[in-house]
Amino acid sequence: MKVFISHAYTDESFVRKVAAGLEKVGLEVWDATREILPGDNWADKISQALQESEAMVVLLTPDALRSSSVRWEIEYALGQQGYRERLIPVLVGNPEELPKEDVPWILRRLHMIDMGEYAEEEEGINQIAQVLLEAA
């Protein structure tokens, strides 16, 4: 299964960890930090990746919620039958910086993974991978 990771550019270090964890269990990950090269048309690359992907992990941080790109990617996934049951919102960071109430209502109705509930980052990343494997 090809997985698109939607995130704010400020969260790239965590994105790399998530991508590595998903690839470790055999999932194919599309990540803008690796796939978009200097000179590439950013919008075209994102559009193509969204069309080719079968699942989306949305890393929800304060910066991601302010990002028009992340909002657009979420709207795309919500409108596509292929992403049904395969849109995974992930709350990242301090709950005081991003209370669940700040997450758009449409994402709150989905099962959300809260990284703050795991003692180790790796445990949360493993949970993301498990949910995706079950949805495959």
Task: Describe the residue ranges of each PLM region.
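Active-site-adjacent loop/helix micro-motif of nuclease/hydrolase catalytic cores
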Residues: 65-71
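Conserved N-terminal substructure of TIR/SEFIR domains
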Residues: 1-59, 78-86, 92-95, 118-136
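Short amphipathic alpha-helical segments
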Residues: 1-3, 108-111
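Short acidic-hydrophobic, aromatic-tinged amphipathic segments that line or gate anion-handling sites
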Residues: 112-117
